[in-house]
From Swiss-Prot:
Binds 1 Mg(2+) ion per subunit. GO terms for biological process: nucleotide metabolic process; purine nucleoside triphosphate catabolic process. Homodimer. The active site is at 69 (proton acceptor). Coiled coil: none annotated. It comes from the Bacteria. Its cofactor is Mg(2+). Substrate binds at residues 8-13, 70, 154-157, 177, 182-183. It catalyses: XTP + H2O = XMP + diphosphate + H(+); dITP + H2O = dIMP + diphosphate + H(+); ITP + H2O = IMP + diphosphate + H(+). InterPro entries: dITP/XTP_pyrophosphatase (IPR020922), ITPase-like_fam (IPR029001), RdgB/HAM1 (IPR002637). Belongs to the HAM1 NTPase family. The keyword Repressor does not apply. This is dITP/XTP pyrophosphatase.
Length: 200
């Protein structure tokens, strides 16, 4: 199997990607197994940050690398929290603190103006200097609820309303969430690309 490094410290993401990429003959290894140092996400877009993370992991391990950058874009807040979704309430903020800050920012905003979407950009770099990395973008439309619902998922899932299923993202079963979510859509694109252009 061909080793590929996943540029994340999130073990949940590592397990999910390992299962999905095994079908393509990949052995997914977390960057933590190589003691890859943290890299500053200095980009101003999801794409830039995903490329920064993938390039850094490829450089430090000598392997092909996959990175994702994702976040929530709220129209009423001119796109915030955006690339700062994980640290919206501060550098070391918890999911709960980020969620509460967003609910406060959206207090009193009418339902019609609560539109939002999750974005996920996945980047696969064959090596550190790959001039044409594979870039896949998934988007999930919904709106911001006025209070949290459900216990599944993480991040902003409890306050993200999913019109297709008339519930919060945190109320979806994991299999259903994968079908609808921004990350699920980006992964589908990645797999379609890998079928057409297998990594050698």
């Amino acid at each position: 199997m061909k080793k590929i490094v996943l540029a994340t410290g999130n073990q949940g993401k590592v397990r999910e990607m390992a299962d999905l990429l095994a079908d393509f003959g990949f052995d997914v290894v977390a960057q933590s197994e190589f003691n890859v140092s943290e890299v500053a996400e200095t980009g101003t877009t999801f794409i830039e940050n995903a490329i920064i993370k993938a390039r850094h992991a490829a450089k430090e391990t000598g392997l092909a690398a996959i990175a994702d950058d994702s976040g929530l874009e709220v129209d009423f807040l001119q796109g915030a929290p955006g690339i700062y979704s994980a640290r919206y309430a501060g550098e070391k903020a918890s999911d709960q603190e980020n969620l509460e800050k967003l609910l406060t920012a959206m207090e009193g905003v009418p339902e019609a103006q609560r539109t939002a979407r999750f974005h996920c950009v996945l980047v696969l770099m064959r090596h550190e200097n790959d001039p044409t990395p594979i870039v896949c973008h998934g988007k999930w439309e919904g709106r911001i609820l006025t209070q949290a619902h459900g216990d599944n998922g993480f991040g902003y899932d409890p306050i993200f309303f999913v019109p297709e299923d008339n519930c919060a993202s945190a109320e979806l079963e994991p299999v259903r969430k994968k079908q609808l979510s921004h990350r699920g859509k980006a992964l589908k694109q990645l797999f379609a690309t890998l079928r057409e252009q297998p990594l050698v």
